Swiss-Prot record:
This is Putative D-lactate dehydrogenase C713.03, mitochondrial. GO terms for biological process: generation of precursor metabolites and energy; lactate catabolic process. It catalyses: (R)-lactate + 2 Fe(III)-[cytochrome c] = 2 Fe(II)-[cytochrome c] + pyruvate + 2 H(+). It comes from Schizosaccharomyces pombe (strain 972 / ATCC 24843). Its main location: mitochondrion. One of its GO terms (cellular component) is mitochondrion. Its cofactor is FAD. It is found in: Mitochondrion matrix. Belongs to the FAD-binding oxidoreductase/transferase type 4 family. Keywords: FAD, Flavoprotein, Mitochondrion, Oxidoreductase, Transit peptide. PANTHER family: D-2-HYDROXYGLUTARATE DEHYDROGENASE, MITOCHONDRIAL. InterPro entries: FAD-bd_oxidored_4_C, FAD-bd_PCMH, FAD-bd_PCMH-like_sf, FAD-bd_PCMH_sub1, FAD-bd_PCMH_sub2, FAD-linked_Oxase-like_C, FAD-oxidored/transferase_4, Oxid_FAD_bind_N. GO terms for molecular function: (D)-2-hydroxyglutarate-pyruvate transhydrogenase activity; D-lactate dehydrogenase (cytochrome) activity; FAD binding. Its EC number is 1.1.2.4.
Length: 526
């Protein structure tokens, strides 16, 4: 029988990148082309009015001194002040709004939308602008409605664990508040220092621990939202059970602002675990990753909180662009991060130690380490959470595909994508080839693969090679073209690969009920 071949992790230096940079502090040195220039098939819908000085004055009177407004029509305004609202964090999508509104209250949101609806002014709701599909920035000159100033935590019940808060509360701030009460927010994301809880709800973000805590569809108990005509929909209940008619709030979770603007949420939060363990494994094959996942679920059962998959390419990028070293001496084709969360430290350590011993004895994994303290735990998580930022440093851009697939075929998509790019003469080490490499990582626990193609520059040849081929591949294997990033602008043309014509028709029918003038989120979603 193998002895436990785990050693203490050598503390690494912190990532030199800021994973949680505030969006409004960013200045874009190299701005992307305007989205409407990159997407030639898109044309501004003439039914939408153009912003006037008179409109701006009305918005100023609505917001008053409480909120904030950036007026691009004012010649004294620095155009760069609107960049953080016009450009997504990947530096891929760029709108041309002349007005960013930051209301402070639900009533202000209501009055803004009522006026926009009457005047047929198009609106894009925006949270932390950390999205990956171009949903949170304008395509043309839509008004940006940013919820960042609506950031109050209103109530918390320490018995039930239900928190009521504004949609503009930063996810990390909400979790820090709950930590002081012995609770945690039931969602964790790599962008937690910038993303807002309302945006998380609007995109139905899954996060790192969906395996343990489920989706926001189950955690959100109540909601306040504003419809496009200004109607305030108050369903801010804190009840676990409410079986009185249709659960309307579910329509807004994952709607991306298509039906209205989420302004407040009530969320049930789990107790914060007193014991957390993290293991990091090197695995010789994807077949063994599947075996490791099965064994892990059997061994850890109720305390398993995360099972994250990373390929060797992703870890090579983290090595290169984070300035950190790998926790394992040798390179391996795949890596897995396993996390447990529980209430009994000794019990949890025994279970995860037994798991490692079993995986080594069965030769399912090649090597592994266990974090011995909080610092090492964070270091191991950075190997996973830092991938996205390191990809952004690898070249001039990244093509991102967030899909869900049956586990047996999940990584086949990465291999097939790489083969296809090579066949099309797009992937090579030389500068004349646009593609640098193909990276696969994701949430193994819920079948969510993040397929990333790092490029030296965005290139239409790459897009034509991959789209709709990737979506056809996913559809053929009974997967979903969007696991958690949403549809936005990027995936609107391809929703038919995951939803039937009848379902798309029903979604459009609901849109006409909630937003007959179509002012919310134009050119996107479905």
């Amino acid at each position: 029988m193998h002895s436990l071949q785990c050693r203490r992790v050598i503390p690494f230096g912190k990532l030199s990148l800021s994973l949680h940079a505030p969006r409004n502090a960013l200045r874009f040195v190299h701005k992307p082309a305007f989205t409407f220039e990159s997407y030639k098939s898109l044309h501004r819908d003439p039914k939408y009015a153009k912003l006037s000085e008179q409109d701006v004055q009305v918005f100023k009177s609505i917001i008053g001194k409480d909120g904030s407004l950036i007026d691009g029509l004012d010649k004294s305004t620095d155009p760069a002040d609107l960049d953080a609202f016009n450009i997504d964090w990947m530096n891929k999508y760029r709108g041309k709004t002349q007005l960013a509104l930051k209301p402070k209250t639900t009533q202000q949101v209501s009055e803004i939308l009522k006026y926009c609806n009457q005047k047929k002014l198009a609106v894009v709701p925006q949270g932390g602008n950390t999205g990956l599909v171009g949903g949170s920035v304008p395509v043309f000159d839509e008004i940006v409605l940013n919820l960042g100033l609506m950031n109050q935590i209103h109530t918390f019940d320490e018995i039930s664990g239900v928190i009521t808060l504004d949609s503009g509360v930063i996810l990390e701030n909400a979790d820090n508040f709950l930590a002081e009460k012995g609770y945690m927010f039931p969602l964790d994301l790599g962008a937690k220092g910038s993303c807002q809880v309302g945006g998380c709800a609007a995109t139905a973000a899954g996060g790192l621990r969906l395996l343990r805590y489920g989706s926001l569809h189950g955690s959100i108990l109540g909601m306040e939202a504003v419809l496009p005509d200004g109607t305030i929909l108050d369903n801010l209940v804190t009840l676990r059970k409410d079986n009185t008619g249709l659960d309307i709030k579910q329509l807004f979770i994952g709607s991306e602002g298509y039906l209205g603007v989420i302004t407040k949420l009530s969320v049930i939060c789990p107790k914060r675990p007193s014991s957390t363990n993290v293991a990091f494994f090197g695995v010789p094959s994807y077949e063994n990753v599947l075996k490791a996942f099965s064994e892990t679920r059997s061994h850890l059962t109720e305390i398993l909180s995360a099972f994250e998959l990373m390929d060797n390419t992703s870890q090579t990028l983290v090595d290169k662009y984070s300035g950190t070293q790998r926790p394992l001496e040798d390179e391996h084709p795949f890596y897995v991060l396993v996390e447990t969360q529980g209430s009994n430290k000794e019990h949890d350590e025994q279970k995860i130690t037994a798991l490692v011993e079993d995986l080594l004895e069965k030769e399912i994994i090649s090597d592994g380490v266990l974090a011995q303290d909080e610092s090492q735990l964070r270091v191991l998580w950075e190997r996973r959470e830092g991938i996205t930022e390191c990809l952004a440093k690898a070249g001039s851009g990244v093509y991102k595909y967030d899909v869900s697939l049956p586990l047996p075929v999940l990584y086949d998509l990465v291999n097939d994508t790489k083969k296809r790019l090579i066949e099309f003469n797009l992937l090579d080490d030389t500068p004349e080839h646009p593609v640098i490499d193909v990276v696969g990582f994701g949430h193994m626990g819920d079948g969510n693969l993040h397929l990333n193609i790092a490029v030296r520059q965005f290139d239409k040849r790459v897009e034509k090679c991959l789209e709709p081929w990737v979506y056809e591949w996913v559809s053929r294997h009974r997967g979903s073209i969007s696991a958690e990033h949403g549809l936005g602008l990027l995936k609107k043309p391809f929703v038919g690969y995951s939803k039937s014509k009848e379902m798309i028709h029903l979604m459009k029918t609901l849109k006409n009920v909630f937003d007959p003038n179509g002012i919310m989120l134009p050119y996107k979603y479905v």
